[in-house]
Amino acid sequence: MVNKCGKELRILLDLDKFLTLKNAKIFVFSSLARNFVLSLRQNKKCMKYPLGVQSFGSIRNDGYLYIDKTALVYQIANGGKYYFLSRPRRFGKSLLISTLEAYFLGKKDLFRGLAIDQLEKEWKEYPTLKLSLNVANYTSAKVLNDVLNDATNSWCTQYGITVNGETPSLRFKNLIIALYKKTGSKVVVLVDEYDKPLLQSLDDRELLSQIRGDLKAFYGILKPMDEYVQFGFFTGVTKFSKVSVFSDLNNLTDIAMDQRYVELCGITENEIRTCLDSQVGEMAEANGMSKDECYERLKKTYDGYHFEADTVGIYNPYSLLNALSSKAFKDYWFETGTPSYLIEQLKRTNYPLTNLGTEEITADVLGNIDTIDQSPIPMLYQSGYLTLRSYDKEFEMYHLAFPNLEVERGFTRFLIPYYTQLRSDQGQLFVANFVKELRAGKVEAFMKRLESLFADGDYQVTGNAEFYFQNVVWVIFKMIGFYTEVERHTSDGRIDMIVKTSDYFYILEFKLDKSADEALQQIDDKQYAKPFENDSRHIYKIGVNFSTKTKRIDGWKIAE
């Protein structure tokens, strides 16, 4: 069900239902009402995209687009006690929490016409405590305690209750008991962005330990409270294991990789074709392409998230709706920011960027984040920068890759100032000049530009110089945007790369602590150019040597 035109549409739907329940004599009028409703639904001026709107009530009352997820909401609400769901940022977690809140508060009118309207018969109201930790910058443990105390005070005011307790966790416990005694109903607890305080303290072990302890105590009071609690749901970007704040809540059901709920957040292609087909058509027209071409480009740019093996692809809802609203293909998700802790973890662990897109990992490692010093892959996956591409059943290994073009392009662009001497505002221009030189066959200008990236040999170089060189080359050539093939052998530091343009082939061999002549010789010895000999495009062979001592390119040669 798509809610498009607000109160007017809902009034017409109610009128249509009423008239239909009467007699056949007014069927014609009822049909006219239906046709008018359909015309409203097709009217592009009626479409209101819920960009930045996270309140289920606002979406339903104010006529915003809503793609019906309530059948899954009903299944969750009536199928278990405590749930945990991790999804990338801007993926609809807050809206899901708001939807659950409306359901448990018994707000039946908000769900009229949705799937749950036919499933729920009782619509019982429960005292509901919703907590969002996305409201502060957690620079100290006191900030967290203040947020928890403020939330408890707000709940007490909302329900007319006074509770005591020396700590937020004790006050939380006493509030739940008091609510149960006052209302006679069990309490619902909904927590959004549970992990924000943890993520903001990753680089401060002492603060991380304090915050972990406080959250563990706060959530831990739910374990012995079964007789007072009806339901609990926690969302976040990441799942922590050894630093878990849920270790005392051992009956928490993790549905992050549950096939039944992969469509709970985000939008599927079927939902787009069912609910947004006319809007895709409008976007296609605005961009001078066919509707099929527009679907294909939307899929390539924003689809591709998989939260379990062999499941339907999920579109990033924030990016998709922004694209349809503005009728432009842009990297909307990255405009909202990329957490710097991800880049710091990549650099801290000397992670070879050439491995991105080829990683394989087991489910137990993938679903848990232990420390800030471990592999960055679980964090990259849970944060939405990598997704499941395939699954090896025999060895129970997942193959990870970038989900779509927006993430691959945006993530690589974001890396430039962290791995090169370029500022963030210089990177795109630098890459554009690279591309122009390659297209024009200006190979010497291209190589001088590449060489200049390493001119300051001490710039942000930490740890293994070989990884530094490989990572810089990977970032730049990834940004160039052509078909690029990279082979890396850590035993001798070799990188083979082929770049193709409409008029040229560039075959590059990179060496470490050897010579440009040796690199060129290997291109000939390995016959890298042989597959392209019958192609009309001009072939350039380029040998490059990088010095781990000076951390610069100390020689390059070109052959044709």
Cite the ranges covered by each PLM segment.
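Mg2+/Mn2+-dependent nuclease catalytic core
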Residues: L208-G213, L512-A529
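Phosphate-binding site recognition
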Residues: K25-A465
